[in-house]
């Protein structure tokens, strides 16, 4: 089997295509959640707690200075506000996935299982049993 044909069979499997679609949809969903958190939820929470912009929250470890040559040495800062926004995004995405999985499980569990058809062996044994009863 040629390398190209093997690759084509690999790519055309249902699982690979499903995974590719899921990755694309997941990336788009991530952008939506990022916009939701950055532009709507974080500002609302900031207003509720006194006008704080979470993305700007930081801890300055060392202030900016000017060295002997007159060049500015930037401050050493831990920007934990963006980290808080990322945690909030994660929680929202995890909750959305939880809801989706819960709905899928509900649909799967609601579908009645098709009646199991007995195998030929079982049918033959039943026929023998019924004929012996007579």
Swiss-Prot record:
InterPro entries referenced in this protein's UniProt entry, alphabetically: Mechanosensitive_channel_CS, MS_channel, MSC/AndL, MscL_channel
The keyword tRNA processing belongs to this UniProt entry's keyword annotation: no
Lineage: Bacteria, Pseudomonadati, Pseudomonadota, Gammaproteobacteria, Lysobacterales
Chief location of this protein within or outside the cell: membrane
Quaternary structure note: Homopentamer.
Protein name as annotated: Large-conductance mechanosensitive channel
NCBIfam families according to UniProt: mscL, PRK00567.1-4
Gene Ontology MF: a single term: mechanosensitive monoatomic ion channel activity
Keywords: Cell inner membrane, Cell membrane, Ion channel, Ion transport, Membrane, Transmembrane, Transmembrane helix, Transport
Superkingdom, taxonomy of origin: Bacteria
Job of this protein: Channel that opens in response to stretch forces in the membrane lipid bilayer. May participate in the regulation of osmotic pressure changes within the cell.
Topological relation to the membrane, as annotated: Multi-pass membrane protein
PANTHER family given in the database record: LARGE-CONDUCTANCE MECHANOSENSITIVE CHANNEL, MECHANOSENSITIVE CHANNEL MSCL
């Amino acid at each position: 089997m040629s390398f190209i044909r093997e690759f084509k069979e690999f790519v055309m499997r249902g699982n690979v295509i499903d995974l590719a679609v899921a990755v694309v949809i997941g990336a788009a969903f991530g952008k939506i959640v990022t916009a939701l958190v950055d532009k709507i939820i974080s500002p609302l929470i900031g207003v509720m707690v006194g006008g704080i912009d979470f993305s700007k929250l930081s801890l300055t470890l060392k202030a900016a200075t000017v060295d002997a040559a007159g060049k500015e040495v930037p401050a050493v800062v831990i920007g934990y506000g963006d980290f808080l926004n990322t945690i909030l995004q994660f929680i929202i995405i995890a909750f959305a996935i939880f809801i989706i999985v819960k709905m899928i499980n509900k649909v799967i569990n609601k579908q009645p299982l098709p009646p199991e058809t007995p195998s030929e062996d079982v049918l033959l044994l039943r026929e023998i049993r019924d004929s012996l009863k007579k």
